[in-house]
């Protein structure tokens, strides 16, 4: 017997009568005729568990750092040594970018002793500082640079065992010389550097409204290497508008984040939080005049969902990812599903996980960034379908209007067996 979820339409909430007292409004408590809602407390995840970072270089301005914290981030990004105190005061962590180190990491002629001397000088001030997550090394290296970057990474770990060297990789199709293909590029990185994680960037949303299938191909490739080497991966997604990339929308942010979650990612960064002073860059969370834009609220919303789902998500192990239709190259289709016999209602990405007690979990994602959609699904086994709310973190029986997904949105479901 299969467990089936059917979509039903409930009476619109607008038909309900709402009464709000001044005291309730202050506390964020709204009394409806049929239910009462209290604004939930959102606890930010630790970056060691799930990194949420505004990608780029962040000033030591107190208000700017407070805004980053309020937006749901647990990292401040890259900061110069003199700004570390401000990061600590804001309750964030950071990667330190030292001008005496990062410009020299591609210098293959520098001896190990010279590297260690520079690294020791950099880390000496911050070894016991809880706000220093690690140290910036390099962005987007080609494979021939891995060996030299490894020397710097080893020196950092030797000087400060708790520190993480930051190296971010190129996207699929842009890996450059020195590797046979993208899979080889990732494999070389994991083997040569012995890295504690994989970070990469890939921007796949365009101003004609399209989403490149390479979004999923890249996630597929990184997930395989991540699982093989038992290291987490972080994804840098599009958080501003530039070149021929799309204007920032909630649907676009939703898809990039929920797709990363469906593939088992353990970190999200947004390129960029501060708008660069160049070209057609726009729609970043903070514009060129240091004013917050509507993108800031969009980021806060999706970051809130990451932080709310996190306590459940972090207990899960990724076991499969598939597309029910429109299967991209190098990806799997519905016939690979471990838990579901049917998914209907649109074009979806589904991540499958095993949770505590061998509980089946699925994260279903609407691949349409422009339109909402209802969905239906059938589990292969019998049981009660449950949903973990992205707004409260509570897991309750699934049904009713929860069977709708916003553009790019996702839903975390599980099967409670009898």
Regions found by a protein language model. Give the residues of each.
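Sec/Tat signal peptide C-region and signal peptidase I cleavage site
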Residues: 18-22
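Glycan-processing catalytic domains of CAZymes
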Residues: 23-383, 387-418
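Bacterial N-terminal signal peptides
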Residues: 7-17
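Positively charged n-region of N-terminal signal peptides that target proteins for export
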Residues: 1-5
């Amino acid at each position: 017997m299969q467990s089936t979820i059917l979509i039903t339409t409930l009476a619109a909430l607008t038909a309900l009568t709402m009464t709000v007292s001044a005291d309730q409004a202050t506390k964020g408590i709204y009394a409806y005729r049929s239910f009462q809602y209290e604004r939930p407390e959102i606890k930010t995840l630790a970056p060691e568990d799930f990194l949420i970072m505004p990608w780029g270089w962040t000033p030591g301005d107190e208000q700017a750092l407070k805004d980053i914290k309020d937006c749901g981030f647990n990292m401040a990004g890259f900061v110069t040594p003199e700004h570390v105190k401000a990061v600590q005061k804001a309750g964030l962590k950071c990667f330190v970018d030292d001008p005496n180190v990062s410009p020299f990491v591609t210098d293959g002629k520098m001896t190990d002793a010279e590297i260690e001397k520079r690294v020791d000088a950099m880390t000496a001030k911050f070894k016991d500082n809880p706000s220093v997550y690690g140290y910036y090394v390099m962005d987007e290296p080609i494979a021939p640079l891995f060996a030299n970057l490894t020397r710097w990474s080893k020196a950092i770990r030797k000087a400060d065992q708790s520190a993480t060297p930051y190296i971010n990789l190129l996207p699929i199709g842009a890996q450059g010389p020195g590797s046979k293909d993208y899979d080889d590029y990732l494999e070389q990185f994991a083997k040569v550097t012995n890295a504690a994680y994989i970070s990469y960037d890939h921007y796949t949303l365009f101003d004609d409204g399209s989403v490149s299938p390479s979004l999923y191909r890249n996630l597929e490739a990184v997930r395989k290497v991540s699982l093989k080497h038992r290291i987490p991966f972080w994804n840098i997604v599009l958080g501003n508008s530039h070149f021929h990339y799309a204007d920032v929308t909630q649907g676009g942010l939703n898809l990039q984040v929920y797709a990363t979650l469906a593939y088992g990612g353990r970190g999200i960064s947004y390129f960029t939080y501060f708008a660069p002073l160049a070209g057609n860059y726009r729609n970043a969370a903070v514009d060129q005049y240091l004013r917050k834009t509507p993108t800031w609220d969009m980021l806060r919303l999706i970051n809130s969902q990451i932080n709310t789902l996190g306590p459940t998500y972090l207990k899960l192990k990724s076991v499969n990812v598939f597309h029910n239709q429109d299967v991209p190259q190098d990806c799997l289709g519905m016939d690979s599903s471990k838990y579901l016999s049917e998914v209907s209602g649109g074009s979806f990405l589904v991540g499958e996980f095993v949770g505590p007690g061998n509980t089946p979990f699925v994260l279903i994602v609407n691949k349409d960034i422009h339109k909402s959609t209802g969905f239906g699904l059938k589990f292969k086994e019998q049981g009660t379908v449950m949903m973990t709310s992205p707004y409260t973190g509570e897991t309750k029986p699934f049904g009713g209007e929860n069977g709708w997904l916003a553009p790019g949105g996702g839903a975390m479901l599980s099967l409670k067996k009898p």
